């Protein structure tokens, strides 16, 4: 890898396709930044949510932003990406036409990935 954007695996996935496709990592970061900015401007809401969770506001804001960035984690699933093969093949030209699709929603796919792969690693300190 020589540091070019195309060498980063995450840039080969789409997050939105209308009006034009938008890279999934960019979409996730856009949502996280927007949500963070919203809470920074709404002090009372931020204070209330942090207090309800028993967290200091800066800690709550950091976790909130982190989870917003993960909100579309399930869209990395090949079965989701295959819903728009035209965009997928443009981003991953060597892939060939994907045949695996799933009726499962991307939120369920992301939650499954979180529970099966990420959460256990956090528990183990990986």
Which sequence ranges carry the predicted segments?
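Metal-dependent phosphohydrolase cores
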Residues: 1-126
């Amino acid at each position: 890898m020589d540091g070019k954007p195309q060498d980063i695996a995450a840039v080969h996935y789409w997050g939105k396709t209308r009006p034009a496709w938008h890279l999934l990592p960019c979409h996730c970061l856009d949502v996280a930044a927007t949500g963070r900015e919203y809470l920074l401007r709404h002090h009372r809401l931020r204070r209330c949510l942090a207090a309800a969770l028993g967290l200091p506001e800066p800690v709550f804001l950091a976790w909130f932003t982190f989870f917003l960035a993960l909100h579309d984690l399930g869209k990395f699933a090949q079965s989701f990406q295959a819903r728009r093969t035209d965009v997928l093949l443009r981003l991953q030209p060597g892939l060939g036409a994907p045949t695996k699709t799933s009726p499962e929603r991307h939120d369920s796919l992301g939650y499954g990935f979180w529970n099966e792969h990420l959460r256990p690693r956090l528990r183990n300190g990986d």
